[in-house]
Amino acid sequence: MLVLARKVGESIFIGNDVEVKILKIDGGEVKIGISAPKSVRILRKELYEEIMAENKKAIEFDIKDISEVSKFENR
């Protein structure tokens, strides 16, 4: 992990087209602005983890469920 110190108004670039800028520091909260192409997905970590958990649940299955579906195919 790369750790950098930045002041308000300073920024970093990730690759050639993603800029992360420090907008405001207030107590324990840091406000950042991110400029990136629309093709770059930007998510808060907690939202990303929630999406990944839902995706994992969506691909889990019980073998009983498959046998139930096969009953409909035989009609």
UniProtKB/Swiss-Prot annotation:
GO terms for biological process: bacterial-type flagellum organization; mRNA catabolic process; negative regulation of translational initiation; regulation of bacterial-type flagellum assembly; regulation of carbohydrate metabolic process. GO terms for molecular function: mRNA 5'-UTR binding. Keywords: Bacterial flagellum biogenesis, Cytoplasm, Repressor, RNA-binding, Translation regulation. GO terms for cellular component: cytosol. InterPro entries: CsrA, CsrA_sf. Belongs to the CsrA/RsmA family. A translational regulator that binds mRNA to regulate translation initiation and/or mRNA stability. Usually binds in the 5'-UTR at or near the Shine-Dalgarno sequence preventing ribosome-binding, thus repressing translation. Its main target seems to be the major flagellin gene, while its function is anatagonized by FliW. HAMAP family: CsrA. This is Translational regulator CsrA. It comes from Thermosipho melanesiensis (strain DSM 12029 / CIP 104789 / BI429).
